[in-house]
Amino acid sequence: MDNSKLTPGEHVASLRRLWKECFYDTDEFIDMYFTRVYSPQVDYSIERGGRVVSALQCLPYNMLCGGNAVLAGYLSGVCTDASYRRQGLAGSLVAQSVADMHRRGCTFAFLIPSGSEVLPFYRQYGFYIAIRRSAMPIRHSGNVTGGTCTVTPATAYSDVLYRLFARRQRERRGYALLHSREQFKTVVDDWIKGGNLILTARLGKKTVSYLFVRPDNEKKVLYVYDAPAGRDAAFASMVGQAQGMYPGYDMRAYITGHRAHNTFACARITDTSKALAAYAAMHPEADMQISVSGDKLIESNNGFYTVSHGQCTRSSAHAGSFTAMTLAQLTRMIFSGDKMSFNFLLE
């Protein structure tokens, strides 16, 4: 959304300056983001006085809901020049991106808030806490069964690594955001350049698993991202290798779901019918009649819905006993209890 006369090159240069002022990222990261993530198609921005003063990027993703694929969006880089804040600029961009996602057929939108202080701002536009995350201790006994694995650090992206990653995401129960080959390659490159580890485990000549590890040298903790659900020989071998490389460090794996308690990400339902259809397919035992109200941005989301036998139907008239739900209550219901694979790739 372009409201000024900057050339495309001037626009991107101004947007990069605004990004650096707001987020303090390194030049290397900014170069990577604007070369491999940013495009004019995902850009929402406002120009004033010959420069970009407010912006966000709405990145498209595919998402699995219990094995069924839907479209989703992720809001990245929401920022406003300090001189133009409290004028509703960022809010107008968020509202426009939400409306556009609905028109494109997206079921959900996501974002990672910079802190608890911005949650009230995003609630105005229908974003509510949906995903909590915690770092849980990993206990490594040193006993490995099921075969001997050779563990080596990956030094660059490989198609083998991507295939393992894609398979792990598709095997997860609950909700999972999927990442394209190019998105994953971007993350791998940035992860390695940032001094982090990607360990791979090989049984014989076959690479069977991987582990993303971020060392925190101040806390002396190794954080594991996107850990496999099972704790097999490959996992134990990689944990042992990581601890051998960083003796004396604790090791923790990030988890989401009912055991997690730290606010991590917010979700916005952009299509109630599709969201409830996905929920119904994942919960065939659910039998309920819901009246959804209060969505001022997407009024078509408001209405009467019946969830039964793994399906969702919509009624144009009030018939029967419906449970009234706000968008916030519906978001909590859909994401409560189910694990959401929403990992480091978006941080």
PLM region spans:
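A generic, well-ordered mixed alpha/beta core segment in the N-terminal half of proteins
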Residues: S97-M101, C106-I112, E117-F121, Y125-I129, ...
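Active-site/acyl-donor-binding loops of N-acyltransferases
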Residues: Y125-V144, Y225-A233, S237-L346
